[in-house]
From Swiss-Prot:
A Pfam family that the UniProt record links to this protein: Aconitase
Recorded name of the encoding gene: leuC
Catalytic activity from the UniProt record: (2R,3S)-3-isopropylmalate = (2S)-2-isopropylmalate
Any one GO BP annotation for this protein: L-leucine biosynthetic process
Gene3D superfamilies: Aconitase, domain 3
UniProt entry tagged with the keyword 4Fe-4S: yes
UniProt key word Amino-acid biosynthesis: yes
Protein known as: 3-isopropylmalate dehydratase large subunit
Family listed: Belongs to the aconitase/IPM isomerase family. LeuC type 1 subfamily.
Cofactor note: Binds 1 [4Fe-4S] cluster per subunit.
Length: 471
């Protein structure tokens, strides 16, 4: 039998209908829903007199527009209406909802895995581009638009052209202070935001295998920033250990049977990819973005580049525009860039291990004068556990603001806005113009890099710092 990739296996397992020259009709195993991209979809069902085909394969929460200081005081009318609409729609159509009173509420891409909804071999969709996060479990997960949200609600299927396959192999071990966030930023920085266009990426190699599930989620989360339709990692013992005992994961003998099926999903030895990229893990350093897309990045010991370093006029002009927006001069050492804001959170880096890592840098220190620092847990479960471990108190003692769960300052859609012209060291995934607020200047970094920037008031090389034990 011809060796297959995990991408091929999952895709073929879910084709409901195929016609040459047309998209395949795929069955969807899990549909995650939030308040921003779903109201029009539900209204479409209502107008057409349709029901949700599989409420049991649908799960909803609110995250994008949720205030993180007091979640029950929603002053923005649009946000208030969207949240109320989600509650109303879930009641009407019988969809499970983790609402603002629920201990299970959080960012949709954080709670899916922690509840055990996300499982290997599943097709998973959500009206959010960072649905690729769930690929860390060996699932085929991708974002969809509002019209597609309606289609999945009504039919539990989706029309999709099959992308090509791209293997990115990270060989060897990562050095001290280098994290999963640095790996994905380095990939995008070296190969560009279009490297994955037209592909689904499978991440492989020793460095990936040595990562925890939460680190793998960071990698897959930002595969969309590399232009890919999705990103995933073949499941292994780390995957199975994470899922065991989760609320919606199989139990007892059923779990053992599931593990047998999940093991068979891994890409076969000798499977062919349309393209392969290999990277030596030891060449990756802590990364910082200096521009207005995730590829505009360099190592923390680097400098802001000159436009003339880039080959094409188009690239040179893009760099000039980015530097003007960011208020940076070519040749400036990255460690000389001051920050006025620090945001530790988002679906990329708001899990318990992220907060532990950040707290290990912060413990016993104080936030630098003139810096406002936020820590926003990715879910209420993460918040509860972080408080139980004493992590929250470490942040509070250092001068950080400790918040409720939500998307927060990742995007300029809720009260957590970065002011115009100010620099923010952010653990989120996008640094486009205005992403964190009009005129906000975003630098994407890992949780430890963000924590260090909060303490020192500028970027520092975390490889030169000593972390404190926190648990």
């Amino acid at each position: 039998m011809k060796p297959k990739t995990i991408i091929d296996k999952i895709w073929e397992n879910h084709v409901v209908y195929r016609e040459e020259g047309k998209p395949d009709l795929l069955y969807i195993d899990l549909h995650l829903v939030h308040e921003v991209t779903s109201p029009q979809a539900f209204e479409g069902l209502r107008q057409k007199g349709r029901k949700v085909r599989r409420p049991d394969l649908t799960f909803a929460t609110m995250d994008h527009n949720v205030p993180t200081v007091n979640r029950f005081v929603i002053t923005d009318e649009v946000a208030r209406n969207q949240i109320a609409a989600l509650e109303r729609n879930c009641r009407e159509f019988g969809i499970p909802l983790a609402d603002l009173h629920s201990e299970e509420q959080g960012i949709v891409h954080v709670i899916g895995p922690e509840l055990g909804l996300t499982q290997p071999g599943k097709t998973i969709v959500c009206g959010d581009s960072h649905t690729s996060t769930h690929g860390a479990f060996g699932a085929l997960a991708f974002g969809i638009g509002t019209s597609e949200v309606e289609h999945v609600l009504a039919t539990q299927t989706l029309w999709q052209h099959k992308p090509k396959t791209l293997q990115i192999c990270i060989n060897g071990r990562l050095g001290k202070g280098v994290t999963a966030k640095d790996v994905i930023l380095a990939i995008i920085g070296r190969y560009g935001v279009g490297v994955g266009t037209g592909y689904i990426i499978e991440f492989t190699g020793e460095a990936i295998r040595r990562m925890s599930m939460e680190e793998r989620m960071t990698i897959c989360n930002m595969s969309i920033e590399a232009g890919a339709r999705a990103g995933l990692i073949s499941p292994d013992e780390t995957t199975f250990a994470y899922l065991r005992g989760r609320k919606y994961a199989p139990k007892g003998e059923e779990f053992d049977k599931a593990v047998e099926r999940w093991r068979a999903l891994a890409s076969d030895e000798g499977a062919k990819y349309d393209k392969t990229i290999e990277i030596d893990a030891s060449t990756i350093a802590p990364m910082v973005t200096w521009g207005t897309n995730p590829a505009m990045s360099t190592s923390v010991d680097g400098v802001v580049p000159h436009p003339e370093q880039f080959e094409s006029k188009t690239e040179q002009n893009a760099v000039r525009r980015a530097l003007e927006y960011m208020g940076l001069k070519p040749g400036t050492p990255i460690t000389d860039i001051p920050v006025q804001h620090v945001f530790i959170g988002s679906c990329t880096n708001s899990r318990l291990s992220d907060l532990r890592a950040a707290a290990s840098i912060v413990k016993g220190k104080k936030v630098a004068p003139g810096v406002r620092a936020l820590v926003v847990p990715g879910s209420q479960q993460v918040k509860k556990q972080a408080e139980a471990e004493g992590l929250a108190q470490i942040f509070i003692d250092a001068g950080f603001e400790w918040r409720d769960s939500g998307c927060s300052a990742c995007l300029g859609m809720n009260p957590d806005i970065i002011p115009e012209g100010e620099h923010c060291a952010s653990t989120s995934n996008r640094n486009f113009e205005g992403r964190q607020g009009k005129g906000a200047r975003t630098h994407l970094v890992s949780p430890v890099m963000a924590a260090a920037a909060a303490i020192y008031g500028h970027f520092v090389d975390v490889r030169q710092l000593e972390a404190e034990p926190v648990c």
